[in-house]
Amino acid sequence: MVLIRVLANLLILQLSYAQKSSELVIGGDECNINEHPFLVALYDAWSGRFLCGGTLINPEWVLTAAHCDSKNFKMKLGAHSKKVLNEDEQIRNPKEKFICPNKKNDEVLDKDIMLIKLDSPVSYSEHIAPLSLPSSPPSVGSVCRIMGWGSITPVEETFPDVPHCANINLLDDVECKPGYPELLPEYRTLCAGVLQGGIDTCGFDSGTPLICNGQFQGIVSYGGHPCGQSRKPGIYTKVFDYNAWIQSIIAGNTAATCLP
């Protein structure tokens, strides 16, 4: 029965890509409750303050942005509304955290990826299921889905009760360079959004997935302030370039390094 529900949820996710890109994380529409079973909420263990998002990639592992690291945080899986709990929500602590050992700590954009091992495996359910690592790199022009509990207004931050979703496009790096002269090829990032502005991830969407043509291709990393500016699309960590590192860590090779 759980398998049937998981397959149904994945179908909803696929259908979401057929929608027009009129849904905004900034001032936009709520995600369907069944389209994000892999979405994880990271929050401060003491205050309960929401910190970041993440993505469940198997029963024991979550992928997020390195800049989301915090001393004391918990992870909530299977969540949708902050006020109304799903019956199958589960909470986990980080058992181990892995950041690329060759990351330049003074560069936020460099290797902005963190792999978290949960203190115990989660049980898959109607609202909890993984998102697989990408089998191939994304193509420029791909339709991509963004989602998160981050701000839905660009300047004065306004946070929604449920995650908001939007469709954007994967852009050529050349189109992003004018807005981000600090962006270097070795940062291994993707650029995605709408060049005229108005559709974007925003504050506290960090760590959430960029899903292009159904594949987990990026992690929300960086962007302009205020959010949604023209010529300033979002910057995402390119997950495909870290596949080998992720798989090595999960297999037990905790000394593995990322590509330069």
Curated annotation (Swiss-Prot):
Record's Pfam families? Trypsin (PF00089)
Please describe the organ and tissue distribution of this protein's expression. Answer: Expressed by the venom gland.
The record places domain Peptidase S1 at 25-251
Q: What class of enzyme is it?
A: hydrolase
Is Hydrolase one of the keywords UniProt gives this record? yes
Q: Where in the cell is it found?
A: Secreted
| Key words, A-Z | Blood coagulation cascade activating toxin, Complement system impairing toxin, Disulfide bond, Hemostasis impairing toxin, Hydrolase, Platelet aggregation inhibiting toxin, Protease, Secreted, Serine protease, Signal, Toxin, Zymogen
- Which pairs of Cys residues are joined through disulfide bonds in the record? C31-C165, C52-C68, C100-C258, C144-C212, C176-C191, C202-C227
**Listed GO biological process terms:** proteolysis
Q: Which residues form the active site?
A: H67 (charge relay system), D112 (charge relay system), S206 (charge relay system)
GO CC terms of this entry: extracellular region; secretory granule
E.C. no: 3.4.21.74
PROSITE patterns assigned: TRYPSIN_DOM, TRYPSIN_HIS
Instruction: State the reactions this protein catalyses.
Output: Selective cleavage of Arg-|-Xaa bond in fibrinogen, to form fibrin, and release fibrinopeptide A. The specificity of further degradation of fibrinogen varies with species origin of the enzyme
- Single GO term (MF): serine-type endopeptidase activity
* Annotated signal sequence range: 1-18
Chief localization class?
secreted
Residue ranges annotated as propeptide in the record: 19-24
Q: How does it assemble?
A: Monomer.
Q: Which family does it belong to?
A: Belongs to the peptidase S1 family. Snake venom subfamily.
Misc remark for this entry?
Negative results: does not affect fibrinogen of human, monkey, bovine, dog, rat and guinea-pig. Does not release fibrinopeptide B.
* Protein's name according to its UniProt entry: Thrombin-like enzyme flavoxobin
UniProt organism field: Protobothrops flavoviridis (Habu)
